[in-house]
């Protein structure tokens, strides 16, 4: 069946404060090209993206594919309570390919998700996962929140959207991670035509214990263009 709606986008990013395990510092330059696809389906939704990144130490391709199955749609019963709009079975496949030794992996996450109704939010999701990580990497648990907030100032349209990932620390070599990434974007495309979405802005990334490495912390602001 055709999607109820779908969206495809391309994003370019450039920042100078990316953290990397080679030097355990966050003063590394990185350029990233991202393609994203999201769709609302009859029985759930789908989100996927791929990053092609180049920094001082490596070239890498990272992607995530995240299908979710709506229990409301499957059962024909609205599963709503308070701010919860729907309950979903959630899954994610994370994969990385890099010329940096030991950086390739495939992780498989599965769990339960919630769609939330929050005033002023275009969308809000909360997912809880068990992560089966690459062999040699400790399995853990993860919480992922995703959100989008449209803002209108005068005749100008802005969008604040992003995600927050928090994962558990399992042992001395696998620290608890927190990755909070938000994009602050202005739609300059509406000045080209009413239906054109061309965003410029910044992406702010706060990533504590990046890659589950204790003390590898990132606080980066990247220039952004998205179409």
What are these regions (language model features)?
Residues 48-102, 177:
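Surface-exposed loop and membrane-interface regions of Gram-negative outer-membrane beta-barrel proteins
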Residues 26-30, 58-62, 82-84, 103-107, ...:
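Transmembrane beta-barrel outer-membrane domains
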Residues 2-53:
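Short glycine/proline- and aromatic-enriched beta-strand/turn motifs that initiate or cap beta-hairpins
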Residues 38-40, 68-70, 113-117, 146-150, ...:
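Transmembrane beta-barrel domains of outer membrane proteins
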